[in-house]
A protein has these predicted regions:
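NAD(P)+-binding Rossmann beta1-loop-alpha1 motif at the extreme N-terminus of oxidoreductases
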Residues: 1-47
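Short, charge-rich amphipathic segments
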Residues: 13-26, 51-54, 97-103, 107
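N-terminal short beta-loop-beta anion/metal-coordinating cradle
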Residues: 41-61
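Rossmann-like NAD(P)(H) cofactor-binding subdomain of soluble oxidoreductases
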Residues: 55-56, 61-124
């Protein structure tokens, strides 16, 4: 099984490390300093509760074309970035790919200048 974490910041990297710990083949899409840190150092997951550590070195890239087609894609981006990256998923998709949204960071202005029921609604 191949799973891609699309948006591997803190939450995405944590999910990816947990999946790798379970023996699943995981690839991470991330960028900038976080990408460089993962490529150079891998991921170290530490549990404050149990005191255990888990180290892994997943395939990490900023280019979805570097990764084979996936069985699952977990999108762990901030809400304001999700729509902008939808087209970037296409190289990862096959007919049976499942895409799971784990989007976070819904800002108060999310509905600003939208139409319909939620037009200009302020998230509280």
């Amino acid at each position: 099984m191949n799973i891609c974490i699309f948006g591997s910041g803190a939450i995405g990297s944590y999910i990816g490390a947990l999946l790798m710990q379970s023996g699943i083949n995981v690839s991470l899409i991330c960028r900038g300093e976080h990408l460089n840190a993962i490529k150079n150092n891998g991921l170290l997951m530490q549990s404050a509760e149990s005191g255990t550590e888990y180290f892994c070195k997943p395939l990490a890239t900023d280019n979805p074309k570097d990764i084979e087609k996936q069985d699952f894609i977990i999108v762990t981006l901030k809400a304001h970035s999700a729509a902008l990256t939808a087209n970037m998923l296409s190289p990862l998709l096959k007919e049976s790919t499942t895409v799971v949204s784990a989007v976070n960071g819904l800002p108060w202005w999310y509905f600003y200048k939208t139409s319909g029921k939620w037009k200009n609604y302020r998230v509280k």
